[in-house]
Amino acid sequence: MVENFEQDDFDMLDPAAKQVLAALSQYDRGLLVKVDLLHRKTGLMPEGMNDAVRHLEKSKLLAVLETPKRLGPYEIYAVEITDLGREVQAKFG
């Protein structure tokens, strides 16, 4: 999978998205991370967090828990790093 993701693809990621990916890679595989915990780990404000998560989800580097529940100003409730996200972070991060 990671062979389809190149250094240029990683370099094009927003710095906030890279920060979110790095923070998520510290958690065990299969663990959902609530957005408020991710905020504490990254220090990103809601707009930056929402943008980073949308970008990473489009790139298939993380999965968003589909739920109507939201935490405050965040558009999401919880996320999980994908296997591709782990591989990309390990290779390029």
Segments predicted by a language model, with ranges:
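A short, conserved structural fragment
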Residues: E57-K69
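Short, solvent-exposed loop/turn segments that connect beta-strands within catalytic domains
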Residues: R70-E75
